[in-house]
Regions:
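N-terminal subdomain of nucleotide-sugar transferases
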Residues: 2-4, 8-77
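Aromatic "clamp/platform" in nucleotide-sugar-dependent glycosyltransferases that forms part
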Residues: 313
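Carbohydrate-associated surface elements
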Residues: 69, 192, 213
Length: 407
């Protein structure tokens, strides 16, 4: 434990608050606490946290990132892809029973280091990602050091009681309620997420919706106007992502489109079952499971594909939809998820009812046979991202909110 404290103390001071090469010194210094952040070996993990930070300095905000990981998990290493971040490992109880008190353990690991950092380089605000454990630790730090804090809510389970059951789940819910009530603002990535927070908070919560963004330069349209004949999905291979539904829909559609194939980027516990399903549906030869890929590989695949489909039934927003839209592709997504606040059906994307096989078959059939419609939707999708969902847009919204909270 002493070695951990010494190491993390050194890391925090080594990071400091870097002002980069620009001459204009930002007026505001923000400490970001996050359980997910990109590394050189996994540049997709937490990209939705890292990418807006690159634009924050333009809006007078400088961020110091502390990415955290429990001691009992495999270390992510120290290969953060940006010099403003360091990984810190903290002790906690493994399993669901350990999630509720994890923020207190994290606070205990951080308080002395953050206090010294605050004394030497004033921290104006703490921004935590997810209520547990980072939000809880941020609220405790906020109270101890008299620094305002905000918490971003990234998913549709803001109280963690859907993923953790029984007594432990109820404990998680109560701690999360405390976090949302105590934070200066609960930042929600969609209105749907905000509604879930308000419905479950059991007391007034100050929420603000700030949508995630997309790096529109990385996820740019293809130079060539001759895409490959593939339908693409990007997502973990877990039931809620809808890969099974899409395989069954493609089994019905592909006989009418003999040149079309299906590519899936992602990995997870459903891999073997989905592979067997593709074989059972007699489309195994036209389905490629590509596994995890880098951000560049994902962007290249999106540029190459004919259209993007992910009939996920449980998405707070879904950054992959914005990324595909930014590459000028028609996107198929589900109603009732965060993305339907951005997609206008038939205009800049295509929406189906969750779990509706016939709806998905119809959507695929319409879009695969209509080049002009795909092109119109893709162009509108790209305009949508450029007009409202770039990293600069998100950074500007965050900077405005930060200043409201410290005023």
């Amino acid at each position: 434990m002493q070695e951990l404290v010494a190491s993390t103390q050194s890391d925090l001071h080594k990071v400091g608050f870097r002002f980069g090469e620009k001459t204009r010194q930002p007026a505001m210094q923000v400490l970001t606490l996050t359980p997910f952040y990109p590394t050189a070996s996994d540049d997709a993990n937490g990209c939705f946290v890292a990418e807006p930070l690159r634009a924050m300095e333009e809006f007078g905000v400088n961020s110091c990132v502390v990415a955290v990981q429990p001691l009992h998990r495999i270390s992510p290493g120290s290969d953060a892809i940006t010099p403003i971040a360091r990984w810190i490992r903290y002790p906690c109880i493994p399993g669901g029973i350990g999630l509720a008190p994890a923020g207190a353990f994290l606070y205990a690991s951080l308080i002395s280091k953050v206090r010294r950092l605050h004394q030497s380089r004033r921290i104006d605000l703490i921004h935590a990602h997810a209520a547990l454990p980072c939000g809880h630790a941020a609220v405790l730090l906020s109270r101890e050091l008299n620094i305002p804090c905000v918490v971003t809510v990234h998913g549709l389970d803001p109280f963690f009681d859907k993923q953790v059951h029984g007594f432990a789940g109820e404990w998680c819910k109560r701690v999360a309620q405390f976090v949302y009530r105590s934070a200066s603002r609960a930042i929600c990535i969609s209105q749907k997420v905000a509604e879930n927070v308000i419905d479950g908070a059991a007391a007034p919560v100050n929420t603000t919706v700030i949508y995630n963004s997309v790096d529109t330069r990385m996820f740019s349209p293809a130079v060539s106007d001759t895409p490959s004949r593939t339908v693409l999905s990007v997502g973990n291979l877990i039931p809620i992502k809808g890969h099974e539904l899409l395989l069954r829909a493609l089994a019905a559609v592909l006989p009418h489109f003999p040149e079309i194939s299906y590519e899936i980027i992602g990995d997870g516990p459903e891999h073997q079952r989905l592979t067997r399903l593709a074989s059972d549906c007699n489309i195994a030869g036209r389905v490629r499971f590509l596994g995890r890929q880098s951000r560049k590989q994902v962007a290249d695949a999106m540029r190459r594909c004919l259209l993007f489909a992910l009939p996920s039934r449980y998405e707070g927003l879904g950054c992959v939809y914005l990324e595909a839209m930014s590459t000028e592709k028609a996107v198929i997504a589900c109603r009732g998820q965060g993305i339907d606040e951005i997609i206008r059906h038939g205009s800049n994307g295509w929406l189906i009812d969750p779990g509706n096989l016939q709806d998905l078959i119809a959507a695929l059939s319409v879009l695969l046979q209509n080049l002009q419609l795909r092109r119109q939707i893709g162009e509108a999708a790209r305009r949508t991202t450029l007009q409202s969902f770039t990293s600069a847009h998100q950074a500007a919204h965050l900077a405005t909110l930060y200043r409201e909270c410290v005023a």
